[in-house]
Amino acid sequence: MESIQLINIGFGNIVSANRVIAIVSPESAPIKRIITDARDRGQLVDATYGRRTRAVIITDSSHVVLSAIQPETVAHRFVVSKEAHANSN
């Protein structure tokens, strides 16, 4: 059985590291389109607490999560989480 790895994406919000496909910046037109499409489908999770969106997390279930922390910070937490899991086995 695979253990659940979690990543803090800011303000006490957590996502499953096992479900993350991509962590991207929200500035490009294709990413803005992905956000709009997810909102229309009801699969957008806004975890920014009213702050500016700095990272967009795309999951394998087609959910899109908006975060107010930088993509590099989320990616670093992702890597640290994976390394900690590898060292515990």
Swiss-Prot record:
It comes from the Bacteria. It holds the Pfam family RemA-like. Belongs to the RemA family. This is Putative regulatory protein PCC8801_0196. It comes from Rippkaea orientalis (strain PCC 8801 / RF-1) (Cyanothece sp. (strain PCC 8801)).
